[in-house]
Amino acid sequence: AAHGWNPVGSQFRVTRSRGFWLRTLDGRPASETYAQLFGYPAREWAFPPLSHLARLYPLGVEQGDQLIIRSPIRVEADGSFRMNAPVRDGVDAYLLVGSRISCENAAQQAAQQALQQLEGAKPVLVFILADIAWEMLLKSHPGAEIAAVQDILGKDVPLAGGYTLGQIVAGKESGTPQLL
């Protein structure tokens, strides 16, 4: 699944987590790890605007040959992160960044994949689900992801969609939507 996020070199080991709560990275509270990277005190990550900024720096967790996104949706008072999807202990996680261009490229890649799966049939409806962080990244270019999809599928195909708190893709076997 195309997601538009790229690793920037920082790698961490998830040393303590439980379901959707990411407690520690490399043995330190998750907010302390982000504080060291971005230069703001760890206690400030629990409050706006930094609590919102954390969403723009998700973690990529290896699954097969790709990185799946795990985004902090809330920074807790104890310095842990409430994530958009479960994170397992012991996995390696990579700090990710995105940009308008990478989001547009990912949208075009996803549209191209969808078109290939239609095997020559013309799409009658496009349903777009994008991570809420894209809305934050594209705030100065609203609709950029829609235009990118229309560049591939055409402007005459009706569109519907919305923002999600994670990657939702068609299942490989059944085609049933699944949260990665």
Question: What feature does the model see in each segment?
Answer:
Residues A1-K139, G143-V157, G162-L180:
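Small-residue-enriched flexible segments
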